[in-house]
């Protein structure tokens, strides 16, 4: 990650790191403050854009001022620290009084065999610091005292006795202000979290969602008042929500800013707990907006919460009775460790029995809360594997706890209240494990072997995995797989592919990359970093996009050799393609995705679960073209329009110019052939660029930008309101300018308005770039010289035109109207274009500008934000800053490290099952989680849909095969034997046979493969022995029957 103010901070940080590595103990808060003084609270928006989209500036600033202690640097502590350093807190102090063991290499990716024997905390400092030089990372060794804790806003303990935890928590709880205390443990396949943020903790934003809004259509004078909204979009209000009103005409009493309560919320209306019978009558207009009040949470201290835990946060409702038992189990383990000063030995019957006895003993003291039954088998698994910190569990809980620290330091999102327990005991092999299988082998995988046994470990090491994508998810997966030993034997292989390169904005989450990797391929850099984590990892990094075009690379032999596929993708199209290949080759697919604090995982297991493509989210609703171009009513509409205009003016039109200049004859011929309104518009834009609007000096670019301002934000609005005055009525007699339409007003230009001047300068700079005109320094910031240059431009007076057609129909797909004279106009334009082109200097060309959102120095977002905000000003829509504009126009997907880490941890818990084999669908889990609320919803996957016909049944996972170089007739007869009447056979997008076409009957006695070669132009590669055809069938009652893909093995 790139540092902020590196020149100020780096030297002091390095000195402090030397101090901690020399074993001189902690860095004091004063030293840390001095070293970080140069950092300030400025935010590198290029670097943190995806995280800013989740947290916002205020939360980020609070994080920048937070000092955090992480105690216990086994895998869980390392994961928490990693997520906090990436998030950008002020400082992270690592504490551990133990030394690195080979055992730790199963879960802590900062450690290597060379670190064995060193203090764990000190061994992690340097590599953690590399992730973000703007965060001060230091180590504290030796005994921890309560006085140490006073230096922090939040403290996290991952390996501490219950007695000590209660002592520290009491201290933290009693401080003013309280210090947030978090205790979390990962013990084998079991984990726990406890949070105490003090007697009264204020949550500033409970869910992180944008406040819901609605456009008012009517309000009754009643008690309670009925508020109806336009049916453009469903309302998201819930009973009990508080809302405020603005812009209401008539019933102006509601515009007082007072929050009012919603009740009986419906999709397009709700009642307001307000007597409006004496208010003015509603006339028109109005925006209703949700108010999100702060929430105060009262936490119990740990000592009290242990005996009165209240409701546990649930995750898997098939394990409804599990949390109270695990609450007991962790206490029993603590007692075992306190009395014997060690963990139970894996597979030791005596040790397991002792933990069970402790659990029974503690249970007997619980009175009304005593459990009626204790699952001894579950406690056996818990105790036996309790010494192990497994990487997937550490990754999952590292995400959860990292997010809780962010909540504690910022007040953003609802804290976990107060206990959370989780287990993945289903990840254990189906066959019982013998004690001998669990014995350590003096290996870096010993912790994992102590839980799963050496047989499964061998399977993991020999696995052949295909991982698609090496971005945020991919980096986490690679780290996890390397620590788990996946593909780490001579027979194992991990193929990684990603066609993307590293950008600056990646560095805040994609922790395998550094600033010096910017511009390099993601896959090769990530693979190299993963091999540093585990040098035995057999990984092959490719830069091919997995798609139909690369099936020569990822061919049949490649797919058939795989054991599992892991998706680390960020788009649905690629996911659907990989899903189709996994179904075709019957390979397990482990799917996951994130959106801000939310994440989901889906297991796609051959013959057991439905595939990814079986259920899809509905497409995002698109605003009608007429709304975006003439009747916007929110900032999203303005930004959609702004980006469209940016691309039209600065990318598409210069590209059209170059297309004409590179081959005038072909270009003109294509325009004549098209002969439509679109071709006419393109020719007009090209001529404008080369004639009337051609720029030769920077002042010409200023003139162009100023006149565009007048055209867009004054003249067009004047024309629109001339065509549709404010009192216009529709053909049905309703007011034309009724909700959601907003009546616009022109913006009058003033060079003293900084936002207007900035927009014109940015637009002029980009216009100049398209013509290759040098940019003067004075033009890069609003100043007196710039204002004078803009004021020089002579702006003609506008005269509205009669008979102008403006698209108002919501289903219109084009703003260009066809005309019977298009062909004649095109001929005139072509003649004009040929004439203009003769005046151009030799070699003239334009430089199209492709929108790039992640470079704040290129003026792209200045233009788009300026476009959108001037448009918003026309329509009295609230304006946004450049950062918010970037999120919307740049279609930035909000992303943080914590949800990504959690998702990959959950997936890797499923990977144990997929590679072990033999598991039933009931053993697998899909997850949806929202760390903001927090919500964890874990459930069994849905089985695939079964289709039945006579005695046959099949699912999406089945493929029918026919052996032999058969004819079409023989294929029809083969299906007839199954009681199916085939009426259509296709290959790819081509129809090989249809019973309705007489000529197709001539093909019946030809080989299927020969017809495919002739009709579908299908060349079957030499490595493939079969051809796939899609057959449409009916049963004897003429009902369509969906049958599987049919593979004809002709070789």
Curated annotation (Swiss-Prot):
GO BP term (any one): DNA damage response
Maturation and modification: The N-terminus is blocked.
Record protein name field: Ubiquitin-activating enzyme E1 1
Disulphide-bridged cysteine pairs: none
InterPro entries attached to this UniProt entry: E1_4HB, E1_FCCH, E1_FCCH_sf, ThiF/MoeB/HesA, ThiF_NAD_FAD-bd, Ub-activating_enz_E1_C, Ub-E1_IAD_1, UBA_E1_C_sf
EC number: 6.2.1.45
Regions crossing the membrane: none
PROSITE patterns: UBIQUITIN_ACTIVAT_1, UBIQUITIN_ACTIVAT_2
